[in-house]
Amino acid sequence: YTKKAQDLPALDHIKTSSDNTRSYGMILKNLFLKNELDCNAKYRQIFTECEEKLDTSDEILQISDFSRFLISCIDIPELIAARRSNYHFLTLELQKIGLQPVCALAENDCPLVFPLRVKNRDSFRSYLMEHKIYCAVHWPFDHFRPEFRPMAQKNAETLISLPIDQRYQKNDMTYLRDIIFQYGGELLF
């Protein structure tokens, strides 16, 4: 599993075996987001299947040589500044409805996501997906000895990673905020 460093096709995938399912999913997502094809249900199915495969995989994954080259062309300070700006925007805005990030951002941190603890995480995640906001689950629970791992189970049920990467501008973060504000379900504990 990798995070996108840029919105470039070569960075949208990782090297695994010859299974092209994830690539098909990314193509469907792109077509759906551009309103060229109503394929969101199929994309969501592929997305879920790929997450399950990655969660249970013991295969060593690696980045392609072309992706490594593209990464060397990225302006890292600009990337960090954009991510930090998006993180701070959501921190200030979501405080208005009582939501706080799971952790504070230290001075030199470059956040990958905006981690948020919410009630009914899966329902909230589905709601966001209906509005074209896709949040990965970084804390799946394997159900191994849950009686000895209550915090792992709690994290799996309540943590969501909101997207804040450098592709998103202020209008995107405003859209995300507005969709969260409009959510009809209960988020606070």
Q: Where are the regions a protein language model picked out?
A:
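Hydrophobic alpha-helical segments with transmembrane-like composition
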Residues: Y1-T2
